[in-house]
Amino acid sequence: MLTRVLLGIEDKTDGSIVFEGKSVDDMTPQEKSDMKAKIQMIFQDTLGSLHPRMSIRESLEEPLILNGVKDKEEREKIILDTLSQVGMAPMFLDRYPHQLSGGQRQRIIIARCLVVTPKIIFADEPISALDVSLQAQVINMLMDLQDKYKLSMLLIAHDLAVVRQIADQIKIMYFGEIVESAPSSEIYKNAQHPYTKVLLKAAPSISKGLEDAGFDIDLKPGDIPDPAKPMPGCPFCTRCIYADERCMKERPEETEVSPGHTVRCHNAGQI
């Protein structure tokens, strides 16, 4: 839902979206159109993200046509250059999505993003549907492309081991609310919110040794809150082993525990 709102597919219910210093609400239709050309999306479903009746060439050519690249030779050059950047050969251009593997489709989807030289790429669980053997390849490729094209990337993921590899800044969300935000290194060595600690413990490749850092915590048996009936207190209180009466009744405010590190927890710094 977050990415759907950011992409303008769904309307926001509150707050504001600012792009390049200007609120989206104050943009003209032309400014919104220009903004959309600078924002691209890598979807989780690789097969559903590509039109089954369009060849790979057509899928890569379409965004160029929509963004005003009228010369066919120029479009072909951009496509071939971009294919090379994602490690795909020209022979794939005349194939169709069902003729490619999941990893190959994901590379084509990334190429489709890059052909229009975006400023921001939203990546929604970009490797969760891939075989483990391919996940590292795609992550390394994203990191290389991010550096080469000077891209900003918003990565949505549940696997903190993956996030650790690629993210500079991490925001932990629970029931649509940011409960902790900090630079990546700070999250992994000094997490303050109980939910963040539970997530870290659940990632086998990074959980070893976390017990000594106070991360050896579990979820409390209980019901998950109903999003349609928001609780007056902390949304995590029904599952938190540290929750007290205040947590049940009073919603925690965002608190800065160190420079650039904020958390929404009444007991931050004490657990």
Each language-model region and where it sits:
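P-loop NTP-binding/switch modules centered on Walker-like glycine-rich loops
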Residues: 126, 130, 134-212
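Helix-to-loop junction immediately C-terminal to a conserved catalytic motif
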Residues: 7
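Charged, flexible cofactor/metal-binding loops and thiol motifs
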Residues: 184-271
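Conserved ABC transporter NBD signature motif
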Residues: 15-23
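ABC ATPase NBD coupling module
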Residues: 24-40, 66, 186-191, 225-231
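Conserved ABC ATPase "signature" region
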Residues: 23, 73-91, 200-201
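A short, proline-enriched helix->beta-strand linker immediately N-terminal to the Walker B motif
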Residues: 115-119
